[in-house]
Design a protein with these regions (language model features):
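Nucleotide-activated donor-binding/catalytic signature segment of Leloir-type glycosyltransferases, i.e.
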Residues: 56, 225-247
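N-terminal strand-loop element at the rim of the active site
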Residues: 9-63, 219-225
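Acidic anion/phosphate-binding donor-loop and adjacent secondary structure
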Residues: 117, 154-175, 189-192
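Conserved donor-binding/catalytic core segment of Leloir-type glycosyltransferases
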Residues: 5-9, 169-200, 214
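Short His-centered aromatic/hydrophobic patch
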Residues: 84-90, 108
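A charged, aromatic-enriched C-terminal amphipathic alpha-helix characteristic of glycosyltransferases
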Residues: 18, 165-166, 310-359
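A short, active-site helix/loop in glycosyltransferases that binds the activated sugar's phosphate group
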Residues: 124-148, 155-159
Length: 361
């Protein structure tokens, strides 16, 4: 089989986020063995990162004129596979492929049905970012089950090489860090409640520790997040918060590595566990608790609550934190979670799954 020429339309509403990170990592993995990748997107930061992998980039205005560009791309036909990401991007792919008649694989990153039942017969396969989304696409999108496979989020291999810091090391200076990492928008507001629940429990369990909430990310509700955390800091005297804004992707795992607890979901959840942080999974559709035991199973299944989970009730956050207040229990929980993720969601493993799903050499 010859190397493939892959057209990758990508469209998201945020300047940077999990979908961007996923597709840039994917491009890197595809280019390395010799596949040709051409992004279609709005430019900006994602273009810079995509081109750094060796991929080409075609800039498109998603608000106007994209359909004409898609038709032109289809007429040129300089690809043998379309790998689309997010609804507007799959529309681009469908328009281009109506002319080109090549293979088309659609990646599903979130729980939106996108009227899949109206167009699923026009694409060759679906890959979904969690087992929860596989179920969603088959059941609610009404896509033929054989067409759908799981291609999960991953953590970079190098993140697993960060040293595992113990419970005592993370608190040795009298300061404990609680990291959140996400776009600051409406669908992420449940994380505030989870942070509040956790920090209340930690303040009581460790009254002599000063707890700092490190908020990584930005977005339309930045002021709301800031206000809520400021109110919490005023109420609990040993709690403060810092709004870091967007942090470089490679620096986020280091912050998580030093954190006693990370409250997040999605790709950031994978990075939290890989980095050696205790993680409280809170996503757009569910809270799946402190990531140990059955909570960890539900977290991996649902992308840490971002994609929804059915017939599941997490264990008590305060109860779990109390049980993990001993150094040995905390250290074991962190070590087990990292090992589980390394065996199923390290970047190298997921890269192989992607090459297989796209039928690349």
């Amino acid at each position: 089989m010859s190397k493939r020429k892959i057209l990758m339309p990508v469209r998201t509403v945020a300047e940077w986020g999990g979908v961007h990170e996923w597709t840039v990592d994917a491009a890197s993995a595809l280019v390395k063995p010799g596949q040709e990748v051409t992004f279609v997107g709005s430019g900006g930061g994602v273009q810079e990162r995509a081109e750094a992998t060796g991929a080409s980039f075609k800039v498109v205005n998603w608000k106007k004129g994209w359909k004409k560009v898609a038709q032109q791309v289809g007429e040129e036909g300089n690809f043998d596979l379309i790998f689309s990401h997010a609804p507007a991007a799959r529309q681009f792919g469908l328009v281009a492929n109506e002319i080109a008649q090549k293979e088309h694989v659609v990646m599903i990153h979130g729980a939106y049905h996108d009227f899949m039942y109206e167009w699923s017969d026009q694409v060759d396969a679906f890959v979904a970012a969690s087992p929860s989304l596989v179920h969603f696409v088959q059941r609610f999108g009404r896509v033929a089950p054989w067409k759908v496979s799981n291609l999960p989020n991953a953590a970079p291999d190098e993140v697993f090489e960060l040293p595992l810091l113990s419970h005592d090391e993370k608190l040795k200076d009298g300061v404990g860090h609680i990291v959140t990492a996400s776009r600051l928008s409406k669908d992420k507001t449940p994380q505030i409640d989870s942070v509040e629940e956790a920090v209340r429990a930690l303040s009581e369990l460790y009254p002599d520790i000063k707890w700092q909430i490190d908020v990584c990310g930005d977005g339309p509700l930045r002021d709301y997040f800031d206000r809520r955390y400021r109110m919490l800091s005023r109420e609990l005297k040993n709690v403060s918060h810092v709004m870091h804004g967007w942090v470089l992707p490679q620096d986020v795992p280091q912050m998580m590595n030093n954190a006693f607890l990370t409250v997040t979901a999605g790709m950031a959840g994978m990075r939290a566990l890989a980095s050696g942080s205790l993680c409280l999974g809170t996503g757009a559709r569910a809270t799946v608790g402190i990531q140990t035991g059955k909570n960890l199973r539900a977290g991996i299944w649902s992308n840490f609550g971002d994609h929804g989970v059915f017939r599941f009730t997490p264990t008590s956050v305060s109860g779990d934190l109390k049980e993990l207040a001993s150094s040995s229990a905390y250290d074991r929980a962190v070590s087990v979670a990292r090992a589980v993720i390394k065996q199923s969601n390290s970047q190298n493993i997921v890269n192989g799954m992607m090459l297989s799903a796209l039928q690349c050499e």
